[in-house]
Amino acid sequence: MGTQDPGNMGTGVPASEQISCAKEDPQVYCPEETGGTKDVQVTDCKSPEDSRPPKETDCCNPEDSGQLMVSYEGKAMGYQVPPFGWRICLAHEFTEKRKPFQANNVSLSNMIKHIGMGLRYLQWWYRKTHVEKKTPFIDMINSVPLRQIYGCPLGGIGGGTITRGWRGQFCRWQLNPGMYQHRTVIADQFTVCLRREGQTVYQQVLSLERPSVLRSWNWGLCGYFAFYHALYPRAWTVYQLPGQNVTLTCRQITPILPHDYQDSSLPVGVFVWDVENEGDEALDVSIMFSMRNGLGGGDDAPGGLWNEPFCLERSGETVRGLLLHHPTLPNPYTMAVAARVTAATTVTHITAFDPDSTGQQVWQDLLQDGQLDSPTGQSTPTQKGVGIAGAVCVSSKLRPRGQCRLEFSLAWDMPRIMFGAKGQVHYRRYTRFFGQDGDAAPALSHYALCRYAEWEERISAWQSPVLDDRSLPAWYKSALFNELYFLADGGTVWLEVLEDSLPEELGRNMCHLRPTLRDYGRFGYLEGQEYRMYNTYDVHFYASFALIMLWPKLELSLQYDMALATLREDLTRRRYLMSGVMAPVKRRNVIPHDIGDPDDEPWLRVNAYLIHDTADWKDLNLKFVLQVYRDYYLTGDQNFLKDMWPVCLAVMESEMKFDKDHDGLIENGGYADQTYDGWVTTGPSAYCGGLWLAAVAVMVQMAALCGAQDIQDKFSSILSRGQEAYERLLWNGRYYNYDSSSRPQSRSVMSDQCAGQWFLKACGLGEGDTEVFPTQHVVRALQTIFELNVQAFAGGAMGAVNGMQPHGVPDKSSVQSDEVWVGVVYGLAATMIQEGLTWEGFQTAEGCYRTVWERLGLAFQTPEAYCQQRVFRSLAYMRPLSIWAMQLALQQQQHKKASWPKVKQGTGLRTGPMFGPKEAMANLSPE
């Protein structure tokens, strides 16, 4: 809230080594006599069922690749491909085809409950799409369909992303901030050309596609001899070229570098091709990288697109390539396709060709001599509706049994952006280092090609401690790093903050707000690619572990922004879709649900979410308090704590009104008033009540740190009364009841009932003198969840269902109680690890990873939710970043063994050394 098959085995392959011939296929171009080339023979491949039985091969990741590599028929392992990650044969087909959650998946009883909401939503949706001509923040009518094609995205944090599928296609685009286009651009390809003794013997597009355009190109690569391996932020694709004794390994690199606030912002990606000649003949190898200017279709409509070659030499390093200028308003950009020039390589180009034609001119140009013609000058700007593409080619000679390297980069420069309301101009973070003028694409390309080796060293230093830890399962190593894709590909923006854009009157009590935002910028990521709201705070509660552990300054920046928004109000009244009630957009001293919609003007207009009036939600204020203390605890930043303390006091004061009977425990309001916004909660509840007690306990700690004895005494009294009420009203001997209402489902086992304890333990609290929930109750509840929500659900193979009835049947009382929420499961697993149930934690989390990444084909688009059968909901969602809470729990367990912090009796305050980033993350961060 995962794409195709490497193929035509090529040219000049002896008949005994061919798979089958596809010359009759009208979509495959089979040149005959062309100057300087031999007859180029095209081969094709059929499925294993047609010609050979499927078999396991020893080339798979021996620990973990499972069924995803069954189809692989090659023997090549590629050049320096790591053993851990997500690996899949390009010929693999996922058999299970699920559909997005729709109204027809709602039970009759739940549909009756939500009929008013449905009618109001339809009315609002029609007005938004047909009258305002805008896109809904959640489009329940047109969900993104299943496409099991996605791989690692390209691009750093906040500069836009381009996702390359696991079959090599460029297929998901987020260049305009927060707005996604799911379109495979056929012209965006890599093509290989092999020449022996001055003649081309093999030329193949490295794509399984057989498109209706560019038909002169040799498409239909055989996927049974290639595989993809992802370990974000890097990915490898290995192509074995049967009959050629050549193996290609393409390594894709993006600068995602923990604790780095410069290179991590760059909108670039690097492709390093390592070519291995396993034969006894010398050969010439060329790789051509072709790229369309824009995405085609409506993207071409305005016209005025043009390309030009460039060459940039700095510090003895030369980079050549093409600039693809896309001046379409309101967010014009320039794309750069470039290659590094070395003593062993030749870089050539073709400035412009028609990507909607047969492509014969480009194909013949490469076929003729393995190089492109390299015309000078810029192309003519296109007419309206006409497409344009270009290509860059790198060539090198390869000795018998030799190896060579060809290096490409892809960069895009969109320095100034406007969100959908077109009200303000914003500058991306990378402009601090590369300028705001829109002419940085050559410099970005040069920088990427000269620095990628250093990036890889830093990535390896960061990841190696986890990858080398033999106590950790292989699936976890893949999940931990690959789920990080969302930090860059979550519609993410990282913006410069202008000094005059911060309101003086609101920020005057936060002394370090301005320096933080000035030095580290403003960060926003979507709740999900389909749930278009920035920094959705009830969900960020789960996802924030990745940010605080890897880019803590961005987490603090986000917290300052949230504090600013909390102190503001917007009394504009609007109708909320669930209740139909008119209420203000935002009330003062309550945490907003989100910071805004990228199709509007985020940060200026918050709370794009209008299903519920979240001013009455019970969890948002509590989650702010808990995250503030957690962030202080892990960073040791006392200035941050001092700045946030008054805001914490204000939001807790707002929360007090929900304790209507003054027993020290808040009550839910009889509707879905928390992150489970389709699951009604009444009275004291396990989830919100637990978060409340945890937040009160944290207030006691912060009051002591801030020297506020009266406030410390006040919250200590509330905590004492609340603990007694929580245990009396909710504990049943095995777990905490869902809520304390008289409804049958009030005794449901909620998988997320220990969320408060989870955060306390992450903050070094929740045991000994700071115990809030009796340890034996917490452990017993977790054991019950494991027995019922995990093992009694789907054979224990799909994670933990949100709600389970005590007799082992999923709770179907709401549209969310019988879902599995991946991010909640990872948080639950972290809680289990914290409480010593490490085996249970890994078993629980593994079910989600196997389901999403190996069974449903949802790699790099992990959804918010799935049910036991048929459906998923909200692809590419923020919450699964909570897997980093598992890593924190593991590190804290290791830290405990090394040095347990001392606790002063009676206060619960640590007097020992701070468990901060240098200690907590020593095995992850080279810094």
Curated annotation (Swiss-Prot):
Substrates-to-products reaction catalysed: a beta-D-glucosyl-(1<->1')-N-acylsphing-4-enine + H2O = an N-acylsphing-4-enine + D-glucose; a beta-D-galactosyl-(1<->1')-N-acylsphing-4-enine + H2O = an N-acylsphing-4-enine + D-galactose; beta-D-glucosyl-(1->3)-O-lithocholate + H2O = lithocholate + D-glucose; beta-D-glucosyl-(1->3)-O-chenodeoxycholate + H2O = chenodeoxycholate + D-glucose
Gene3D superfamilies: 1.50.10.10
Location within or outside the cell: Endoplasmic reticulum membrane; Golgi apparatus membrane
GO cellular component, one term: Golgi membrane
InterPro entries, sorted: 6-hairpin_glycosidase_sf, 6hp_glycosidase-like_sf, B_Glucosidase_GBA2-typ, GH116_catalytic, GH116_N, Non-lysos_glucosylceramidase
GO annotation (BP), single: glycoside catabolic process
Region (Disordered), start-end ranges: 32-62
pH dependence of this protein's activity: Optimum pH is 5.0 for the hydrolysis of bile acid glucosides.
The keyword Metal-binding is assigned to this record: no
Keyword 4Fe-4S: no
E.C. no: 3.2.1.45, 2.4.1.-, 3.2.1.-, 3.2.1.46
Main location: endoplasmic reticulum
Record field: transmembrane: none
Function (record text): Non-lysosomal glucosylceramidase that catalyzes the hydrolysis of glucosylceramides/GlcCers (such as beta-D-glucosyl-(1<->1')-N-acylsphing-4-enine) to free glucose and ceramides (such as N-acylsphing-4-enine). GlcCers are membrane glycosphingolipids that have a wide intracellular distribution. They are the main precursors of more complex glycosphingolipids that play a role in cellular growth, differentiation, adhesion, signaling, cytoskeletal dynamics and membrane properties.
This protein's name: Non-lysosomal glucosylceramidase
UniProt source species: Homo sapiens
Gene label: GBA2
